[in-house]
């Protein structure tokens, strides 16, 4: 979507307390920061802004996301390890879990979880949704954090009365 249209939509929905979900590749995040910061709505990063897991959680792109998340208007979906992984489901997406864990630990009130079902355009493998549920406790081991991730935060974002 062109930025001017994106901004117009954001301006229209702001009065309703709605939010914008952005799908962005991590390497494009830096150039979008001023634009995203200027939007009047909350902004939710889909798929953790697609970090390059090979660079680790200290990579420049993921650090940019973490810095943005310090501003309360930004939220993040801890979704799609199956799209980001290099090691795959056989290793419980262990290369993606540190990213999910870091977001959940640092921003427990502004992270969401989902399966990305029905997993459109998957090329490598079809994920097992049961396994995706099972790994929640690996990156959000505390019951209180799981409740925020799965219940409280979605309620706050989607039904922010």
Predicted regions mapped to residue ranges:
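Generic anion/oxyanion-binding catalytic loop in active/binding sites
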Residues: 21, 121, 135
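Alpha-helix N-cap/helix-start motif
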Residues: 89, 122-125
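Mid-to-C-terminal alpha-helical segments outside catalytic/metal-binding sites
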Residues: 102, 107-110, 124-161
């Amino acid at each position: 979507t062109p930025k001017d249209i994106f901004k117009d939509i954001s301006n229209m929905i702001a009065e309703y307390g709605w939010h914008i979900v952005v799908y962005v590749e991590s390497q494009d995040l830096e150039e979008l920061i001023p634009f995203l910061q200027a939007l009047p709505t909350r902004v939710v990063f889909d798929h953790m802004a697609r970090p390059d897991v090979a660079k680790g959680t200290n990579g420049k792109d993921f650090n940019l996301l973490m810095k943005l998340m310090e501003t309360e208007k930004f939220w993040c979906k801890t979704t799609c390890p199956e799209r980001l992984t290099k090691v795959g489901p056989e290793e419980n997406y262990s290369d993606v879990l540190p990213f999910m864990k870091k977001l959940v630990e640092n921003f427990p009130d502004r992270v969401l979880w989902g399966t990305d079902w029905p997993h459109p355009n998957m090329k490598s493998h079809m994920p097992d949704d049961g396994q995706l549920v099972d790994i929640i406790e690996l990156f959000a081991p505390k019951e209180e954090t799981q409740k925020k991730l799965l219940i409280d935060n979605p309620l706050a974002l989607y039904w922010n009365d």
